[in-house]
Structure formats: C-alpha cells, structure tokens
C-alpha cells in the first residue's frame, strides 16, 4: 500500500500558486484495508475514502473504460493491481497527471516538489514549463465533459495555450456529436466555474475554436462578426465586446450571477436583421427572450436567471438613466423590483458597469450611472409608504389608487434631488 499526492495541489505548487485542497491516491490497497485503518467510505461510483482525522479524500487507484453513452457510461476497475501509471493515464491533462509520494509531504500539508521524487510518466511538468494544456491519452475522447474542462483551465491559466493535437481531438469530438451528449448539470457546472476564473473569455474562445460553443451556446457563438456602431463601440465586433465585458466582470470580482448576466446581456444583437446593422434597435427585449432558452437548456438556477433577465431587458435604460426625468427613473426602479430587492439591483448596476467598461478605450472610465441610481433608490425608498397609503385611504383611495399615490410620492422625492 503506497499513498501519493496527485492532481491540482502538485500542479499549483509547481506553478507557484496557492495550494488549498489535497487529493490523495492509494495504490495497492482494498476497500477493506482502508476501512480497517479507520478511513470512511464516501464514493458512490468508485472507492473514495475520507481520512479519519483530516477528512481529506483518498481514492483507490483505478482504471476507467467507456462502456455506454453518457456521463455515467464508464466501467470502473479499482483493485490493488492497478498501478500508479495506469491511474494517472485515465486523467484528462498531463498537468493533472503528476504524483508525489506521501512521505515527501509534511504533516502540515507542506511539500517541496523535487523532480527526482515526482512520478511524471506523461511529462506534465514539461507542459507546465511550456504553458501547454495537453491531453494524456486518446481516452480523452471518451468523456466530452473534458472539452469544457480544458476550456475552463484555459480561463484559469490564461497564459497557457491548448496543445494543437488536443485542440484537433476536441474538434473531432465535436464533429462526431460528442458535445450533443453532454448533460445539463455538468455543462452548467463547468460554465459557472469557468465564469468565475481569472479570465473567463478564454473559456469561450477555446470552446469557439473547437466548435463546441456553436453547439452549447449558439446564441453567444453567433455574436462574432456582428458589427456595432464604432462611435459607441470602438471594438465594433459584438463577440469581442462580450468577451471584454465578462473579463471586466472578473476584474471587478463580480459574483457568478453578475458574470452570467454579463454573458447574456447582448444575445439579441445576434438576431438583428442584416439591413439594420450596425444599429441594434430593440435588442434588449430580444436578449431577454433568448436567455430563457439558454437557461432552460442548461437548468440555470432561478435567482441567476432572474438577474440576467433584468440586466438584458434594462441595461440600455440604465446606461441612459442620466437623461431620464424623475417619473421615468421611478418606473425604472419599479421594473427592476429595486424597492423589494435592493441588493439585486446593486448587482444589476454592477453588470451594467461591466458592459459600459467592456469597450475599447473605456476600460478605466467611471460609470456615474451606478452611484446616481443608488442615490435615487435610497431617496425613493425613503418615502414613508405606510403614511402615504393611510393618507390616500383617508382621501377615499383604494386598491391600485394607493399604489399610484406611493408612486407619485416617490417621483416627488426624486424630483427634489439636486442635479
């Protein structure tokens, strides 16, 4: 029985990045031996155990063979006769197929990877030095989720490139229809993780390069090559603009709902009639409609979907909010449900700021609309609605008339703001 540190911890340490989680591989052991040592079994599809003290995961060495379509269509063989190299061979990328014997890892989890101690049969360390994402073996093609994982790693390690042979293999998989077999839960899991990486645009660039974006998110894929007015968008291309917007959301450390809203906000520009280009009148409404199909397809959580819809529908009005009178400003707040959900409205404004700054030459410009609308909301929300409602009732108002009285009071308060 021999234990190794494997995967991301080694990769990140070799890159000089912080190491958080440790994944362990056990070669030459049975489930019974692990249980006898106090390890707790937790794996459903293959033998994985929790350490009795640290609660870190220890997996028995295994091989996998594709035996049926789908995410779970694998035959797993885990036994003491599976070697370290056989286990590493089933992994997706060479940079994730490196191992270090546990005796070189301190009790505090610290370790210094030394070339003489590393098990690196697929030259992952060399690929780290050359900044390459390369598949381990041709078995990569058996799991189409790996297309998404490669794209996600490209977003995390944004100075890495995908090895030409790996990109070619990914293209073959897409052309063979492998991307069509991806289950919604896994697609959303990888997309959401990719959006939260350092440079999310790299994920979509890789997916586009291999053809998977046209399969998974055709609404996004068709934005490339669609022009916008150069006066407002010096980058011109809608696809280029979208990538700048989601990278701005990462730069501003936005939450996942905000980043997804940024990804969805301009979908309608891909359906503008060619004769109307480069203008995109009404694209906000079309964007809000198109994102429903995306969210249904990949089972996007409701709260993330709802924020994206508000941003898609209202971002143009928010950009132009400096031109709006008090009544129009209050109606904008009402449409955004800002009085009931002020925190979500702040997220809406952050997504709009990412949109405004995700343009060539506008990256560092201020976005005064955000602070102004927050001030407008604070003023309108400060209206004593219960007192206004009582006064309206005493004057004989009922039902919708009470709501109209509250609306008028908010408009009056906003109209009194300076500037």
Swiss-Prot record:
Q: Which residues form the HD domain?
A: 238-339
Q: Where does ATP bind?
A: 8, 11, 91, 149, 152
In terms of InterPro entries, this protein maps to:
CCA_bact, HD/PDEase_dom, HD_domain, NT_sf, PolA_pol_head_dom, PolyA_RNA-bd, tRNA_CCA-adding_enzyme
Amino acids binding Mg(2+): 21, 23
Q: Which cofactor does it need?
A: Mg(2+); Ni(2+)
Domain comment, as recorded: Comprises two domains: an N-terminal domain containing the nucleotidyltransferase activity and a C-terminal HD domain associated with both phosphodiesterase and phosphatase activities.
Instruction: Tell me how this protein assembles.
Output: Monomer. Can also form homodimers and oligomers.
Q: What is this protein called?
A: Multifunctional CCA protein
- State the organism named in the record: Variovorax paradoxus (strain S110)
Lineage, please?
Bacteria, Pseudomonadati, Pseudomonadota, Betaproteobacteria, Burkholderiales
Encoding gene, per UniProt annotation:
cca
């Amino acid at each position: 029985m021999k234990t190794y540190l494997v995967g991301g911890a080694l990769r990140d340490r070799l890159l000089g990045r912080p190491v958080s989680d440790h994944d362990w591989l056990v070669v030459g052991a049975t489930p019974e031996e692990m249980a006898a040592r106090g390890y707790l079994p937790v794996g459903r599809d293959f033998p994985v155990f929790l350490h009795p003290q640290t609660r870190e995961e220890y997996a028995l060495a295994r091989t996998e063979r594709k035996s049926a379509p789908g995410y779970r269509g694998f035959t797993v063989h885990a036994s003491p006769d599976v070697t370290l190299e056989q286990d590493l061979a089933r992994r997706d990328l060479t940079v994730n197929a490196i191992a270090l014997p546990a005796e070189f890892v301190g009790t505090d989890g610290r370790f210094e990877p030394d070339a003489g101690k590393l098990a690196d049969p697929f030259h992952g360390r060399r690929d780290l030095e050359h900044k390459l994402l390369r598949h381990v073996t041709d078995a990569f093609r058996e799991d189409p989720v790996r297309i998404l994982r490669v794209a996600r790693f490209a977003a995390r390690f944004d100075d890495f490139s995908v090895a030409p042979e790996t990109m070619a293999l990914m293209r073959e998989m897409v052309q063979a229809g492998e991307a069509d077999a991806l289950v919604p839960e896994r697609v959303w899991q990888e997309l959401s993780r990719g959006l939260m990486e350092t440079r999310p645009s790299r994920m979509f660039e890789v997916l586009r390069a291999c053809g998977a974006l046209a399969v998974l998110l055709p609404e996004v894929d068709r934005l490339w090559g669609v022009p916008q007015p150069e006066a407002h968008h010096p980058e011109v291309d809608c696809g280029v603009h979208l990538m700048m917007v989601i990278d701005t959301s990462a730069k501003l450390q936005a939450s996942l709902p905000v980043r997804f809203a940024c990804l969805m906000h301009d979908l309608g520009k891909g359906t503008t009639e060619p004769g109307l280009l480069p203008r995109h009148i009404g694209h906000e409404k079309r964007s809000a409609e198109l994102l429903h199909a995306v969210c249904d397809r990949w089972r996007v959580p409701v709260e993330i979907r709802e924020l994206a819809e508000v941003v898609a529908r209202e971002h143009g009005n928010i950009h132009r909010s400096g031109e709006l009178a008090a009544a129009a400003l209050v109606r904008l707040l009402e449409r955004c449900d800002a009085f009931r959900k002020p925190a979500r409205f702040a997220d809406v404004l952050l997504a709009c700021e990412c949109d405004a700054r995700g343009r060539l030459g506008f990256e560092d410009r201020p976005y005064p609309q955000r602070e102004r609308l927050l001030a407008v909301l604070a003023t309108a929300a400060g209206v004593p609605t219960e007192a206004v409602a009582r006064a309206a009732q005493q004057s004989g108002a009922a039902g919708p008339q009470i709501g109209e009285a509250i609306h008028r009071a908010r408009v009056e308060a906003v109209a009194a703001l300076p500037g």
